[in-house]
Amino acid sequence: MKIAHVALWTRDIDAQVAFWQRYFNGVAGELYVSKNRPGFVSRFVSLASGPTLEIMSLPELLPTEQTNERVGWAHIALSVGDEGLVDQLAQRAQQEGILQAPPRWTGDGFYEAIIRDPDGNTIEITG
């Protein structure tokens, strides 16, 4: 068994897709426009390996209050396979104002930096 895809709601599908392309070399599929659910659009974004992302949007989505801990998914972690790449992505994120925590070794042995996507979702980048 494996995870096929992970779905993410967004208020700005173009910004979210561009983020995944820019930071993780995501390859975006065609825009799907639902004929059954007015306003619903989505795009799949494939990464080099692992599950794909389904980026979805509806005009009536409500913003979510961002808190550190809440019930539900806490974050997504992506292994880029190289400490140097973690450093490069963290530097880019710092310049763009989305770096949440700089690169560091965690107590459980991971080299990681933490960034936020355009909607404020937490993404760990590990080496």
Ranges and model annotations:
Residues 3-11, 32, 43-46, 66-127:
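Vicinal oxygen chelate
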Residues 9-52:
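Core segments of cupin and vicinal oxygen chelate
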Residues 1-2, 127:
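Absolute protein N-terminus
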Residues 55-57, 127:
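Residue-level recognition of conserved beta-strand positions in structured domain cores
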Residues 29-31, 60-65:
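A short, acidic/glycine-rich surface segment
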Residues 49-52, 60-61, 83-86:
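Short, charged/polar surface micro-motifs in flexible loops or helix N-caps
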